[in-house]
């Protein structure tokens, strides 16, 4: 039995209010933020989406994301604001009020921006404007899974079992030296977030939600309506993600 000293934080806006005001979380934080800012006249972000950014050698920049330029014409809002409003803002408020500093489990391999931050600050950034510790920065997903297997640690049922795979078949994680993965969800996070959903192979998060949490699925995929400006937004029946996922080719 494990006792947890937990303080539950609640955001000032709910998910429907956030999506209505700021837009849907699709593709990635980086791409969604580019679309949000480019639509508001940011020339730098527009150049990224058009594939016009060049590096110091005159070659196309790695920050270009022109394959997602079609989202500029999407009939709905797109942004990365949801994470900031529903998670980060609440955490920042708690930090100020409690005067406590965060220890987070972000890993550098999870994204280009996280890797750059780690190379610049290391695992502990105590001198910055927002001091924090990130002790798992140099860990990889395989490190985490192997740690769990070696120590026989319990994990949430939503992840299924940890198994080893040779690319064709799954084996008991302790019987073969191959890459590890979970038979259920590979990652968990906000239920109504579509960041990275286009990369999922096999049954994706929304298809899984359909049979594990049917009421949540209906709220997420169903609902939605056109507003006076011709933009698709949530309504009292649901978030309307179905039309959005259709637009980017993600199954549900």
Residues of each region from the PLM?
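ATP-dependent adenylation/nucleotidyltransferase module used to activate substrates
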Residues: 1-143
């Amino acid at each position: 039995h494990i006792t947890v000293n937990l303080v539950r934080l609640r955001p000032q806006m709910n998910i429907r209010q956030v999506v209505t005001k700021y837009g849907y979380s699709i593709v990635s934080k980086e791409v969604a933020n580019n679309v949000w800012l480019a639509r508001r006249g940011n020339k730098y972000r527009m150049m990224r989406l058009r594939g016009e950014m060049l590096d110091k050698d005159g070659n196309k920049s790695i920050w270009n994301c022109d394959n997602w330029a079609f989202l500029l014409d999407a009939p709905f809002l797109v942004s990365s604001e949801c994470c900031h409003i529903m998670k980060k803002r609440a955490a920042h408020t708690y930090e100020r009020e409690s005067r406590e500093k965060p220890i987070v489990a972000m890993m550098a391999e999870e994204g280009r921006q996280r890797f750059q931050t780690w190379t610049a600050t290391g695992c502990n950034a105590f001198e910055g404007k927002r001091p924090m510790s990130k002790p798992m920065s140099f860990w990889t997903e395989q490190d985490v899974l192997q740690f769990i297997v070696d120590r026989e640690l319990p994990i949430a049922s939503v992840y299924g079992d940890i198994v080893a795979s040779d690319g064709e078949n799954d084996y008991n994680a302790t019987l073969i030296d191959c890459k590890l993965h979970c038979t259920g969800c590979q990652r968990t996070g906000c239920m109504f977030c579509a960041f990275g959903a286009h990369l999922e192979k096999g049954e994706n998060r929304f298809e899984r939600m359909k049979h594990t949490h049917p009421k949540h699925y209906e709220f997420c995929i169903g609902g939605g309506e056109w507003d006076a400006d011709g933009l698709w937004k949530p309504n009292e029946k649901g978030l309307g993600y179905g039309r959005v996922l259709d637009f980017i080719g993600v199954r549900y």
